[in-house]
Amino acid sequence: MAKNVAIFGLLFSLLLLVPSQIFAEESSTDAKEFVLTLDNTNFHDTVKKHDFIVVEFYAPWCGHCKKLAPEYEKAASILSTHEPPVVLAKVDANEEHNKDLASENDVKGFPTIKIFRNGGKNIQEYKGPREAEGIVEYLKKQSGPASTEIKSADDATAFVGDNKVVIVGVFPKFSGEEYDNFIALAEKLRSDYDFAHTLNAKHLPKGDSSVSGPVVRLFKPFDELFVDSKDFNVEALEKFIEESSTPIVTVFNNEPSNHPFVVKFFNSPNAKAMLFINFTTEGAESFKTKYHEVAEQYKQQGVSFLVGDVESSQGAFQYFGLKEEQVPLIIIQHNDGKKFFKPNLELDQLPTWLKAYKDGKVEPFVKSEPIPETNNEPVKVVVGQTLEDVVFKSGKNVLIEFYAPWCGHCKQLAPILDEVAVSFQSDADVVIAKLDATANDIPTDTFDVQGYPTLYFRSASGKLSQYDGGRTKEDIIEFIEKNKDKTGAAHQEVEQPKAAAQPEAEQPKDEL
């Protein structure tokens, strides 16, 4: 899980600064409530009674939940007259007696909305709008057939549209193994894509109109615009849809229609190459074209590509500690947090730098605060560039705190660690250190930092363990005394790494 923290953190940072869906203001009403209220006493029985029911898991204190509430209620009112009626329900997941329900349904944030089908046998995430009209339209589609029939060219034009990925199956008849597999996959993926089927390829706006099927045609608003497949093995068909629906280069800007592709980009297991340029400057289109050409060369080699407009990417700049004067720049991040960075990129350097990266000739980039020129306080300051030397190469027993400057618990612990460090000042075998985890990279394959403060202890012999004991001076000292090794370095000064000159272009400012 730790390996994905950096990726999800960046995704959150990116999307946080993009204009989001505007919710209607909450209004009070004495009208009948159409949203069912469920809890641990009636949840399972209610879900089992319905072929299709939507459940919101919420918390009363959640601002987004409060904004959603009137829209959700309005949608429930409208859908109550649908034939058949679509039932919307809610669970207060903040209530102690409902927390098992929240855990059972993998609720990790609020609001979380789930669609339960077939009495709860099939569960899907709700991925639709959060205003009443959008909720109604989305759930009408979700409660209907997984795939709709296209009977005319007008049907096809309306279905395909201009800015989304849709999948159409062309069949000589609506029966047989190929058709059954297509419908089964449509049912599985219906919350992610729109599916349709037809007996006549001539209705479709693009592609070979003479085919009689069976064939699957995927339409998309990017790259080659449509692509066909005749492999109806369910796994192969799902792989075809997943790969074909991903842009060769994902675009990140203020256009909401691009956001699903951005989410898909960050959910990919691939390494993630991100080129940041100013879309409005001269030469931007040349960069995009060259980047697309290079991306095509590497699209089957474990790298996904994104191009971001600087104006829309301030979250990424804060996350990585980048500066606008380094644009054009490219940064590649692995799921383990390792990064590779090239600032002030020239157009003709793009293919050669990426080739050097693929050949393993580019050194990883470490986000780091400047190495302190003086480090004389009892608790030693460690930064990204000195972490390896202080913790792993010093031959000392090192207790290191990973903290955040804004963290209240860290502030409470700070004077205690000072006292611990003072207690060991005469013992050169022991180092008490701290690292600002918001401004310096941490090797996530070594340290699992899920919250602040997180403390680790590495003995002189190399044994690494996370400290989860009491946070009093006495508890921490007792732990160190029990776990430290003798190094024979007593009465010698602890050597601190010297400050090194840092190239301006290669060391971004680290402010998060």
Swiss-Prot record:
Site (Contributes to redox potential value): G63, H64, G408, H409
EC number: 5.3.4.1
Motif Prevents secretion from ER mapped to chain: 509-512
A biological process term (GO) from this entry: protein folding
Family annotation (Pfam families): Thioredoxin, Thioredoxin_6
Location of the region described as Disordered in the Swiss-Prot/TrEMBL record: 487-512
Signal peptide (UniProt feature, chain positions): 1-24
Positions of the catalytic residues: C62, C65, C407, C410
Residues listed as glycosylation sites in the UniProt record: N278
Protein name (Swiss-Prot/TrEMBL): Protein disulfide-isomerase
Source organism of this protein record: Medicago sativa (Alfalfa)
Lineage: Eukaryota, Viridiplantae, Streptophyta, Embryophyta, Tracheophyta
